[in-house]
């Protein structure tokens, strides 16, 4: 079933946040108007924004989803709000398994894939803990704290696969495709949980064009349940919890690798990463024991030197 188009969104904002939104819209030549019970209303193209005196911000129009996701959430609210409005809708309370990964875009460290089983009581507990998409939690310490709380929730089952660099590189050598590795990993953590609990369905964030990338790796138990892959699946509590579990495991394993190497191994694929890779080479340490070798960064250290 296709996702329902989002053309309206409401959230609470402070006076300062409303002023920040107003300034943003003014700079982009929105037309302002008077609206009953509101400080202001503004419109341009396919977007209408109204700041009510009650503290509510109303966003309407076909551009609602894009504007909320790319400006309002990251720049003003500093948290995810779109997709969480129906957080206690019936489908959020159904028994299911959520799956997510961490480390795919990081040069150093493992690829981690986690699955989490939830039901109604577990979801309500996750809501109280403050579970949300791990990408919206900037502090590694906070990720660690929430991950511990998730594992303490009665009945909440977790499974994790951490493909350390050497293992990851061997798999990539065979599969030659990151999505194939992800498909195998997602299927594995799903099957592992299904051996411990009966769940009618599973959901994961969409990383491939078709669900077949995962389904072809499923075994007997996995083939019997509903499986859904969709964009922004982290708005689902089960997937959000899996994203936190995966991120905590990734950060912990990356830290261990750094300790082993005797240097700090940064996240991502920035200039700091290149400097750390150069340090590993200088120390005569095998790069494939610390990094994902198909990244372009590796070409700087594995390609033969050009001849004069």
At which residue positions do the language-model features occur?
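A short, hydrophobic C-terminal helix/tail in secreted or cell-surface proteins
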Residues: 304-308
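RNase H-like, Mg2+-dependent phosphodiesterase core
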Residues: 1-303
């Amino acid at each position: 079933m296709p996702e329902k188009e989002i053309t309206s969104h409401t959230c609470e904002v402070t006076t300062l946040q409303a002023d920040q939104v107003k300034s943003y819209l003014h700079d982009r030549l929105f037309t302002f108007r008077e609206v009953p019970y509101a400080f202001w209303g503004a419109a341009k193209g396919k977007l209408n924004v109204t700041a009510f005196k009650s503290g509510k911000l109303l966003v309407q129009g076909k551009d609602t989803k894009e504007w909320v996701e790319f400006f309002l959430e990251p720049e003003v609210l500093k948290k995810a709000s779109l997709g969480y409005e129906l957080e206690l809708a019936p489908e959020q309370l159904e028994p299911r398994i959520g799956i997510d990964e961490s480390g795919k875009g990081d040069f150093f460290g493992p690829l981690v894939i986690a699955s989490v089983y939830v039901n109604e009581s577990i979801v309500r507990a996750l809501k109280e803990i403050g579970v949300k998409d791990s990408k919206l939690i900037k502090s590694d310490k906070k990720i660690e704290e929430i991950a511990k709380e998730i594992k303490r929730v009665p009945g909440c089952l977790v499974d994790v696969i951490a493909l350390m660099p050497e293992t990851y590189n061997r798999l990539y050598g065979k599969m030659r495709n990151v999505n194939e590795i992800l498909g195998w990993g997602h299927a594995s953590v799903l099957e592992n949980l299904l051996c411990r609990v009966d769940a009618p369905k599973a959901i994961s964030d969409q990383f491939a064009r078709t669900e077949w990338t995962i389904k072809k790796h499923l075994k007997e138990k996995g083939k019997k349940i509903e499986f859904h892959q969709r964009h922004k699946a982290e708005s689902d509590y089960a997937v959000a919890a899996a994203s936190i579990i995966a991120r905590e495991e990734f950060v912990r394993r990356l830290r261990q690798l750094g300790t082993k190497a005797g240097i700090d191994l940064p996240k991502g694929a920035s200039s700091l990463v290149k400097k750390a890779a150069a340090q590993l080479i200088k120390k005569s340490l095998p790069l494939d024991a610390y990094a994902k070798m198909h990244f372009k960064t590796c070409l700087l250290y594995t390609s033969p030197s050009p001849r004069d």
